[in-house]
Amino acid sequence: MGSLERSKKKAQVWKKAVIHFSLCFVMGFFTGFAPAGKASFFSNFETTSYTSTKSPIPPQPFENATYTQHSLLNRTLINSQSQAPAPAESREAEGETRSLSEKEDENQVKVTPRGLVIVVTPIITKDRYKNVLLRRMANTLRLVPPPLLWIVVEKHSDGEEKSSSTMLRKTGIMYRRIVFKEDFTSLESELDHQRNLALRHIEHHKLSGIVHFAGLNNIYDLDFFVKIRDIEVFGTWPMALLSANRKRVVVEGPVCESSQVLGWHLRKINNETETKPPIHISSFAFNSSILWDPERWGRPSSVEGTKQDSIKYVKQVVLEDDTKLKGLPAQDCSKIMLWRLKFPTRTRLST
């Protein structure tokens, strides 16, 4: 009995030893596959969650996709300063950047705003073609680059007032319509009255621009409205007179060299003693400030008859001050940019 008990105890001891050895072997085997360090399951979980929250955010670009010489230089300076910062080099870089920016500002094209063109159009009451010619003039002025102000002067009429006003509103042109009620027996008196009304309106509101009188039977080269914006005080140009019954063209206007006026083309001379040549109302333009600020151009501020007959005053000033009169176009004053038509009607059209 004693030998059997001893053999059983020895067998149990061996079993325990084998079990302990197996457990130690398994733990050592799996421990060898584990990474070196203090990472744990929880630390791995935190790292994974942090990366997942940051990954959807796209990287921010350093600069725009458009590159210039100035931007590339700035990038090089930033990299060099980050690698080896030095106060002297940073100051030199700032000086170079400022000089480059100043050069770029100088090279930029300076855009100057266009001056206002004020077109005055009187309408003859008895002209049977006035609606057609008014629409044709509107189609021409619509092609002129802004700013442009169209002042239309006509006699008040209940029947035709609505039609002309509606037509002017549909043109898309900035306009002002002036009406009068006076009756005139002379065509020239009616036209002068309408022009004086327009000039008083310009003077009262101090509209600053270049004033041009455009008759309804005028035909324009669109370059004409570009050239008159260059007028400082007074400007003049040649004008061609056309007639349906005559096979010839008569030219009126200045004779000039470059932009200097030397003489005038005269259609006819009624009085040889007349020293001042006649000038057509549509063959000159002037700065509107001569009306409400004459002292700016060396003219007296108060002249008798100026308020009553402004158109006569303007013509007188244009012909008297030759030094401020500029021929257009400046390069070739003989170029025709304005034509005036005469229609074969019993009613005389605007002049």
From Swiss-Prot:
User: Gene deleted: what happens?
Assistant: Dwarf phenotype. Collapsed xylem vessels and reduced xylan content in cell wall.
Name the catalysed reactions: [(1->4)-beta-D-xylan](n) + UDP-alpha-D-xylose = [(1->4)-beta-D-xylan](n+1) + UDP + H(+)
* One example of a Gene Ontology biological process annotation: glucuronoxylan metabolic process
Tissue specificity field: Expressed in developing interfascicular fibers, primary and secondary xylem in stems and developing secondary xylem in roots.
Q: Quick one: where's region Disordered?
A: 80-107
- Basic and acidic residues: bias regions: 89-107
**This protein's UniProt keywords:** Cell wall biogenesis/degradation, Glycoprotein, Glycosyltransferase, Golgi apparatus, Membrane, Signal-anchor, Transferase, Transmembrane, Transmembrane helix
Substitution effect: residue 215 to W: Complements irregular xylem phenotype of irx9 mutant
Entry EC number(s): 2.4.2.24
Q: Where are the transmembrane segments?
A: 17-36
Which branch of life, at top level?
Answer: Eukaryota
Q: Which residues are glycosylated?
A: 64, 74, 271, 287
GO terms for molecular function, please?
1,4-beta-D-xylan synthase activity; galactosylgalactosylxylosylprotein 3-beta-glucuronosyltransferase activity; xylosyltransferase activity
Q: What does this protein do?
A: Involved in the synthesis of the hemicellulose glucuronoxylan, a major component of secondary cell walls. Xylan xylosyltransferase that acts cooperatively with IRX14 to achieve the successive addition of xylosyl residues during xylan backbone elongation.
In terms of PANTHER family, this protein maps to: BETA-1,4-XYLOSYLTRANSFERASE IRX9, GALACTOSYLGALACTOSYLXYLOSYLPROTEIN 3-BETA-GLUCURONOSYLTRANSFERASE BETA-1,3-GLUCURONYLTRANSFERASE
UniProt protein name = Beta-1,4-xylosyltransferase IRX9
Species this chain originates from: Arabidopsis thaliana (Mouse-ear cress)
